[in-house]
């Protein structure tokens, strides 16, 4: 029997993730949305791409969570984007309500699933998903670092004039302006990135990475990134379903790692069939650790706001 992947939210990120999951034949896909006709239409359209692209999986579009029962993976992309004039607290409130609704309906139907959160504010919504689902920490994980690291690697490749495939990089922290790219753990085919790029240019790349999502929002005017976020999500899905033991930066629940507790935070981890199989603690220097603590303070503040609601 093929694995079953349920995607909650049939917007750009959800439907694009569904496409790549189908094209890789990672499993059968259930696309869920509250808007009648949207998941059904997108699901049917995607199904009809199968004979052309050469994939053969079952794709179901529905408004009914019953169709998600016994999923191996649940991906949550549903959420409102931050609008002009909207406070951080307003965004947390709106998306917390959506997340509670999605998880409370989906999790009981798939008690052995791994939940991958994609909605924002990412670290806070992942924390909420763990609370609502009651799942163990290894089976609730947030997609942020894979995307942010991909942006970082892209900008480094552009600057160095080399293939993006040869960039190895690591990034930590919350999904936002306080993220922590780590140049000391960044190489080009094993060669330190500083052999290719000056500190000044590297600092500019780090700042562009931090603002990467906003740069695309500003260019699009209406909407936000979806190709790279969905590709990042599918990379995590593949690592879990194929038990690849990938070392990827993900939002993981910490209990003492890096001196942090009761927080979802972007750290390198081993991702496999058990979900987050272990968190890797890098030997950070004082400067890097200070940036991690600053990022953790921002995430903790957001989680504290959630708890007060």
Curated annotation (Swiss-Prot):
Extract one GO molecular function annotation from the record: L-malate dehydrogenase (NAD+) activity
List the InterPro entries: L-lactate/malate_DH, Lactate/malate_DH_C, Lactate/malate_DH_N, Lactate_DH/Glyco_Ohase_4_C, Malate_DH_type3, NAD(P)-bd_dom_sf
For the keyword NAD, the answer is yes
Q: Which GO terms describe its biological process?
A: lactate metabolic process; tricarboxylic acid cycle
Q: Which Pfam families match?
A: Ldh_1_C, Ldh_1_N
Catalytic activity line of the entry: (S)-malate + NAD(+) = oxaloacetate + NADH + H(+)
Binding annotation for NAD(+): 9-14, 33, 95, 118-120
**Residues at which substrate binds:** 82, 88, 120, 151
E.C. no: 1.1.1.37
SUPFAM superfamilies per the record?
A: LDH C-terminal domain-like, NAD(P)-binding Rossmann-fold domains
Entry keyword annotation includes NAD: yes
* Alphabetical keyword list: NAD, Oxidoreductase, Tricarboxylic acid cycle
Q: Where is the active site?
A: 175
Which family, according to the similarity comment? Belongs to the LDH/MDH superfamily. MDH type 3 family.
The protein's role, per its UniProt record = Catalyzes the reversible oxidation of malate to oxaloacetate.
Quote the protein name from its UniProt record: Malate dehydrogenase
Q: Which organism is it from?
A: Roseiflexus castenholzii (strain DSM 13941 / HLO8)
